[in-house]
């Protein structure tokens, strides 16, 4: 029996700002829509945001009076529907330009926001898509070209709103993550002390069918809804931005989150092949090989054939799930640190890997809501679970929460649903908000971010589109996405990363991981990156760091300053304290393909370090 794909849709709908089934969150960019959305809650968040933005604007006017702000009313009626496209006559590369000052401690940076569209075109000059973007740029202080970083979320089907409003732009939405606080859903926009604007220019990109990015005829939006065409159009946008802004001599970086990480691997190889040489890439909350995440493989393929690496999935996920159990005091004795406990759990799952084989398929099918797809599910006996208490330090309750026929999110704590993006975020099962969205960590940010966007676009970015709607999350994309890549049904992008490193041995790679991320658990990422150990003589500039927090690590007020510090070192090409390297990563699972070979074509090939 094949599991019903609909049973897996909740799993698939939350991969790096993926879309929950049956839910499209749309923000009106038109003036009336902005007013309506801004009035959706109490005035605390919006008034605080307005005051903050006015203060920034006043400071800028005083310090840079010669800089002229240019607002822009975009007349184009953009559509994000699958079969829609713009006529070439409608395409215009226009933008709003605003000037502000960012301050953090004793550091002050005058910066410019540019919000609008550029046209991605193929090698023959034929337009492919008119793509919306927001760029934050600052003048060089030492005469050398500033780095420029291209930033995007994942999905597939997400705009760049989540990284742009949550991470390292000069302003951010102040969430009380992992709590909801008292002012949900009206969290304020504030000055972001951890912005990277003092380090790099930032260009946030919306892929076609998201934000206000639309294909240009004869293409349609759906033309680019696949692993390979997505990379092509993203590459062509980046090349256009570099050309229009004379940035080809700048250090060029990529920053992707969730599905944005396989996109980054593929995009890095595509850019390097095209002669655009990168300085570095950041992989945040990564899913680099869909086959090694059997829950995704089964859901996307709609087949139990996706269970081939189910044991790798169970073992790769468990350390992250255990960190969440520790947060809820389900680990005894309490861990000395998150790092120490991660090491303990890595040892535990490696030791018990063979034992997990008996339960792995049942576990994967249970997580996607179809435990009986292959008959009666098989799980460890109480005796076996009890024997695992001491080496894992997990309580029996936590072990039963992990190994059972129901998803972990509702099994760990009775009467409580915990988040998938961030396992520390929880709501009682009686909370009415769970009826429309089953992930508390998604609820935490979705409405607050869209509320903030509704005021930020016209007031701070100076951009309005009275005939269009901005689409943060397009639910129709993931259901239509062609995941095939490199001759396989799903993307395994470790070979792409290897290819980029072989073309550019100086390419720096930084992997950022949240201990409490249940969407892309950190140990799974370690094991995939470790496949690079199979390439004799390869010694990449790879660093892997870990932080408290979930999928969107930067929402955590402790993690975000640490991320900023690590990223500042990364941009200096310096060693990051505590980061793992390729040599110190744990060895890859024995049944994984070598780094040079896509998983599906060599699923039984042992991946052994030289």
Regions from the language model: what does each represent?
Residues 35-39:
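C-terminal motif of bacterial Sec signal peptides marking the signal peptidase cleavage site
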Residues 41-44:
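Bacterial signal peptide processing site
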Residues 48-148, 159-161, 166, 584-585, ...:
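Catalytic-loop region of hydrolases
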Residues 69-83, 125-223, 530:
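N-terminal cap/lid subdomain of alpha/beta-hydrolase-fold enzymes
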Residues 170-175, 271-384:
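A catalytic-pocket lid/entrance helix-loop region that shapes and gates access to the active site
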Residues 246-259:
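Alpha/beta-hydrolase fold nucleophile elbow
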Residues 256-269:
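Glycine-rich nucleophile elbow surrounding the catalytic serine of serine-hydrolase chemistry
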Residues 285, 289-298, 304-319, 376-591:
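C-terminal subdomain of alpha/beta-hydrolase-fold enzymes, centered on the catalytic histidine
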């Amino acid at each position: 029996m094949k599991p019903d794909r609909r049973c897996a849709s909740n799993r698939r709908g939350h991969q790096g700002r993926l879309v929950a089934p049956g839910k499209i969150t749309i923000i009106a960019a038109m003036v009336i829509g902005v007013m309506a959305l801004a009035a959706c809650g109490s005035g605390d968040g919006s008034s605080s945001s307005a005051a903050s933005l006015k203060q920034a604007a006043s400071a800028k006017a005083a310090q840079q009076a010669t800089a002229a702000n240019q607002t822009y009313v975009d007349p184009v009626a953009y559509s994000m529907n699958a079969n829609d496209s713009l006529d070439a006559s409608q395409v215009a590369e226009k933008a709003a330009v605003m000037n502000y000052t960012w301050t953090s401690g004793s550091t002050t940076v005058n910066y410019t926001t540019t919000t609008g569209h550029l046209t991605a075109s193929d090698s023959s000059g034929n337009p492919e898509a008119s793509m919306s973007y927001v760029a934050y740029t600052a003048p060089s202080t030492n005469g050398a070209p500033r780095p420029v970083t291209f930033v995007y979320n994942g999905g597939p089907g997400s705009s760049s709103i989540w990284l742009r409003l949550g991470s390292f732009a000069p302003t951010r939405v102040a969430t009380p993550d992992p709590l909801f606080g008292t002012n949900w859903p009206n969290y304020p926009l504030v000055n972001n002390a951890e912005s990277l604007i003092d380090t790099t220019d930032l260009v946030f990109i919306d892929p076609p069918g998201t934000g206000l990015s639309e294909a240009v005829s004869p293409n349609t939006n759906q033309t680019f809804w696949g692993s390979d065409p997505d990379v092509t159009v993203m590459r062509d946008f980046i090349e256009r931005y570099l050309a229009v802004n004379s940035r080809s001599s700048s250090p060029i970086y990529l920053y992707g989150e969730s599905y944005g990480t396989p996109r980054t691997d593929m995009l890095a190889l595509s850019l390097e092949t095209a002669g655009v040489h990168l300085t570095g890439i950041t992989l945040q909350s990564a899913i680099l090989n869909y086959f090694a995440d059997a829950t995704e493989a089964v859901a996307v393929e709609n087949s139990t054939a996706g269970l081939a690496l189910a044991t790798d999935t169970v073992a790769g996920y468990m350390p992250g799930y255990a960190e969440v159990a520790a947060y809820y005091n389900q680990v005894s004795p309490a861990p000395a640190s998150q790092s120490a406990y991660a090491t303990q759990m890595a040892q535990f799952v490696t030791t018990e890997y063979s034992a997990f084989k008996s339960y792995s398929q049942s576990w994967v099918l249970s997580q996607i809501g179809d435990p009986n797809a292959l008959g009666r599910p098989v799980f460890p006996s109480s005796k076996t679970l009890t024997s695992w208490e001491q080496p894992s330090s997990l309580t029996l309750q936590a072990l039963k929460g992990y190994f059972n026929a129901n998803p972990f999110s509702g099994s760990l704590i009775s009467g409580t649903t915990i988040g998938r993006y961030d396992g520390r975020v929880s709501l009682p099962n009686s909370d009415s908000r769970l009826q429309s969205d089953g992930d508390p960590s998604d609820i935490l940010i979705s409405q607050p971010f869209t509320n903030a966007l509704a005021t930020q676009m016209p007031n701070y970015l100076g951009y309005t589109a009275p005939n269009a709607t901005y689409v943060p999350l397009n639910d129709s994309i993931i259901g239509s996405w062609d995941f095939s890549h490199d001759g396989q049904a799903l993307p395994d992008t470790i070979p792409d990363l290897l290819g980029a490193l072989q073309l550019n041995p100086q390419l720096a790679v930084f992997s950022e991981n949240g201990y409490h991320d249940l969407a892309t658990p950190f140990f799974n990422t370690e094991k995939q990156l470790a496949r690079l150990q199979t390439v004799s003589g390869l010694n990449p500039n790879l660093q892997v760091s870990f932080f408290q927090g979930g999928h969107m690590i930067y929402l955590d007020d402790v993690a975000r300053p640490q991320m900023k510090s690590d990223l500042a070192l990364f941009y200096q090409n310096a060693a990051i304290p505590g980061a793992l390297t390729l040599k110190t990563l744990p060895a890859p699972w024995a049944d994984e393909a070598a780094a040079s070979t896509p998983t599906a074509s060599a699923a039984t090939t042992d991946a052994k370090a030289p």
